[in-house]
Each structure stands twice: as C-alpha cells, then as structure tokens.
Amino acid sequence: MAKRDYLKITDTTLAEAHRVLRLAARLKEEPKGRRTTMLAGRAIAVVLEKASTRTRVSFEVGIAQLGAQPVVLSTQGSQLARGEPIRDTARVLARYCDAIAFRTSSTARLLEMAEASVPVINALSDDGHPVQVLSDIFTIQEALAASGDRTGIAGRRVAFLGDCASNMARSWLEAAQLFDFHLVLAGPEGYMPPADEVERARKTGHVTITHDPREGAAGADVVNTDVWASMGHEAEAEKRRAAFAGWTVDAKVMARAAQHSIVLHCLPAHRGEEIDDETLEGPRSRVWDQAENRLHVQKALMLWLLGVELA
C-alpha cells in the first residue's frame, strides 16, 4: 500500500473522511482507557516544535491505547535544536517508527518531514490544523445526532469569529469545500485568509466574509472561535486586543445564532477575550467534548493511515 499523509483536510476524499469519523465513533464507544493490540509492535513518533498540551497528550495516550509505542520528541530534546536538517530527522525516524505526527510553525518544515517513507500527520502548522478541524466536525455531527438529527454537517452554517487568517480558520475553509457546508468567516479587516484561498472557496459558494461579529453569528448552527494571538504572535498581543475589541463571543453574539446552535473553541481559551466564561461554560458549549474527541479521531486517523481495520 502506498503511504498516505494527512497534511491538510483535503488529503482525504469525502468518503474517506467519513470512514475515519465512523471509525472514531466506534473507538469512542470503547470503555475509557481500554487498550487494544491493533498496533502492537509498532512505534509512532510525535515531534513537537511548538508547546503543546492537548496535542501531545491526545496523541501519546491514543498511541498507547492502540497498543503501539509513543516516541515523543521536542526540539530541545533532539538534534533538531542543534540544526539537524528536518529531512534527515524524517529519514531516520522512518527507519524506527511506523508513522510521524509533527507539530511545527513552518509549513515548509512539515513538507520536508513528509518526505519520510512513513505516513506523516500534520499536528499543527502555520497554515492549517486539520486534525483539530476534523475532530470538530466529529463533535458537530455528534451533537446533531444527540438531538435526533443524523443528517450531518452538509448544508449547515458554521461561523468562525476572530482571527480568520489563523491556521484554524484556513483549515475550516478547506473543510467547507470538502464537507459541503457554508462557512462564515467573521473578523476585523486585515485578519482574513490569503485572497486566493478565499476565492477558491467563493467559487464553490461555500464562504461568506463579514467584518461584523453579530452578522457573522446570525443564523449559525455552530459558532467557533479561537485565541486572538496564537503562538508566535505574542509580541502583537496588545495590538490584537485593540483590533478585536468587540469580538468576544458572549450572550449578545449568541443571541443572533440559531436557537439550537453550539459553541466550539479548540483551547486554550483566554477567558474574557475571545469568549466569556458564561458562554464557555454554558449549555451550548461543546468545548470539553471537542477536546476529548481529538483522542478518538486521531486514533481513527492513525489506524486508517496504517491500513488497520477494526474487526
């Protein structure tokens, strides 16, 4: 079987993505902490060039639960800190491990890692966070099913409020085209994805752009947000707080969303900035389900990439 990577949402077909999501649902039904032998005898590397809580823990726990050996490397804990070329690291890891999950700020470095002869998963890069967005889609469909609606995300209205130039927003833009839902990108001027990415999505009728938070949330089935200053933008924090003044997802914003709407945030949250406590902890929030679902979706994705089927 030719090796497959998961570097962006569109690295699967729609049918393949739904297959991964169905597998994740089956894995979630297993008792918490149950270990299997599906990947017994294998090792999966998790290489972290950026600080991480949820990504590291969800991959490390998930790999162990599948019966494989997690090998976690940070930049400072490896020869990467001394300038070893990423392609050399990739070639060596591929001799030891069966797959690599890579969290980096550089898409160029991600593509170099993907030269490895084993599957490579984008665990975050500067222009995408596909494992998070795929997990979020799982969370949305799970919430819909819990309310008795099993029609899925297709045709839904998903709003992303905040920094629409972020890796999260850009993966949502790709996801809208693959999963056939309507994405509303709502953010201040100057904080939008590259024009060519927006134009591609607009041609398929899958995106609306607005610079008004309440207009962005209007009629939305899902209201999604993220931090205003991501890792790497700390020096711009004060500038961004000023630019995003009035963009907090709160009761006033949510009053414009559909009555059945849910709220997502990939965490960590800066409470009182992009989202307030009342909304984050309120009945519409699916944030904690969303965090858990990273574990199940990533396990399913690893099984799929390695060609392992559930019995």
Curated annotation (Swiss-Prot):
Catalytic activity, EC: 2.1.3.3
Major site of localization recorded for this protein: cytoplasm
GO biological process assignments: arginine biosynthetic process via ornithine; citrulline biosynthetic process; L-arginine biosynthetic process
GO molecular function: amino acid binding; ornithine carbamoyltransferase activity
Entry annotated with the keyword Cytoplasm: yes
Disulfide bonds: none
Gene Ontology annotations for the cellular component aspect, listed alphabetically: cytoplasm
InterPro entries from the UniProt entry: Asp/Orn_carbamoyltranf_P-bd (IPR006132), Asp/Orn_carbamoylTrfase (IPR006130), Asp/Orn_carbamoylTrfase_sf (IPR036901), Asp_carbamoyltransf_Asp/Orn-bd (IPR006131), Orn/put_carbamltrans (IPR002292), OTCase_ArgI (IPR024904)
One Pfam short name: OTCace_N
Positions of L-ornithine binding: 167, 226, 230-231
Catalytic activity: carbamoyl phosphate + L-ornithine = L-citrulline + phosphate + H(+)
Enzyme type, top EC level: transferase
Associated pathway: Amino-acid biosynthesis; L-arginine biosynthesis; L-arginine from L-ornithine and carbamoyl phosphate: step 1/3
The keyword Amino-acid biosynthesis belongs to this UniProt entry's keyword annotation: yes
Subcellular location: Cytoplasm
This protein's UniProt keywords: Amino-acid biosynthesis, Arginine biosynthesis, Cytoplasm, Transferase
Protein family: Belongs to the aspartate/ornithine carbamoyltransferase superfamily. OTCase family.
Biological role: Reversibly catalyzes the transfer of the carbamoyl group from carbamoyl phosphate (CP) to the N(epsilon) atom of ornithine (ORN) to produce L-citrulline.
PANTHER family in UniProt: ORNITHINE CARBAMOYLTRANSFERASE, MITOCHONDRIAL (PTHR45753), ORNITHINE TRANSCARBAMYLASE, MITOCHONDRIAL (PTHR45753:SF3)
Protein name: Ornithine carbamoyltransferase
